[in-house]
Amino acid sequence: MSIAAGKDFNSIMQMSMKDVAAQMKMASPKLAITTCGQRNNALLRVKEALLANKEAIFEANHKDMETAGANNIAPAVMKRLKFDEGKLTDVCNGIDQLISLEDPLGKQSLARQLDDGLTLYRVSCPIGVIGIIFEARPDALVQISSLCIKSGNCAILKGGKETVNTNRVLFECIHKAVVEVGLPEYSLHQATLHNEIDELLACDRHVDLLIPRGSNQFVQYIMNNTKIPVMGHADGVCHIYMDKDADVEKALSIIVDAKTQYTAACNAVETLLVHKDIAESFLPKLAAVLQENKVSYRASKEAAAILGCEVMEEEDFHTEYLDLILSIRLVSGVEEAIDHINYFGSHHTDCILTENADTAKIFMEMVDSAGVYQNCSTRFADGFRYGFGAEVGISTSKLHARGPVGLEGMVTYKYKLYGEGHIVNDYATGKRNFHFKNL
């Protein structure tokens, strides 16, 4: 399928954000009523389009990578920018998994007869129009678009300027595929100009939810400058607590994976807390494997005395490095580890390494994070690895959705009440009575 954009596509791209959002609000009910088969067919066509146009995608990404290199973009960001065969395979696998998942729409979570002939249902439905502002990751554009298609949501997408060429080609492939199978033309829109972010923030009449992905400063800016509900997370200051009852070999493998498997990810570990009773024996082993994997480390005064490294200031434990750097601190036990995590962490994903079930239970119940793990890498905090097909982001909020936000987090619900001429006055005057029977 050619990615050449038609006249309608180009005219949409030239419209104001306010006008686009208004059109998408009108298209939203039409997308919501599509069948799961129609939406799955659209996803299949998206996958086919991406594979058919992969050379154009890679060429565009090469331009973005060259520009980023010339601008001395940080290595952590450069890693996110790259879209190669591996990334293409990953997003296509994610689409396949999404297709295999059941329809998130029309699912009943309540069926109750209020009275004879008066029946209430609570049924899942799309949120409506969602604005997603994401960082310099072209694969995120594919994941987010796919999730919105499957969940029946219209999406306004604004990617980072660092991948403007890659995002343009990817979006043209996706939009053309979606329209060709009969989904509304205004199902998806790509915002390309920086000033369109502020225009989007003002579209509270037409946009139902914003999902920003980026720095803490950026997410706070979004929250402070819009009336639209915002879902998402800012930092990913993830922790691992090394308990005195941990399996050392298992622990070292997990720590290395959590730090180095994909350093630039928000679910990479940034701080390691070590029980003081095992510090003398464990820290030298840790230092050896970190050095072997080119990970530098900073530590609290007590840990630094053993490691012979830089001493950290207390406030530095808030730092999200997104790099091959690890903060290390000694703690007296699980309670102090929990206090540290709940204070310095970002409520993203935190892990305990221990073979003691009682200690693990305390940690799992008391750490106030979206993901709380035992004996596994924090890198598992991901929609694809959870079997969600993909994720629109990771939410550290406690309302609506928490953790990796897949299909379930992309829907809300409505109440459907079916009657036969029932009026409230009959119940207010005692002519009729509710009997509330769950069906």
Predicted regions and their residues:
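Rossmann-like NAD(P) dinucleotide-binding subdomain of oxidoreductase/dehydrogenase enzymes
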Residues: 100, 109-249
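C-terminal core of ALDH-fold dehydrogenases
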Residues: 41, 339, 343-439
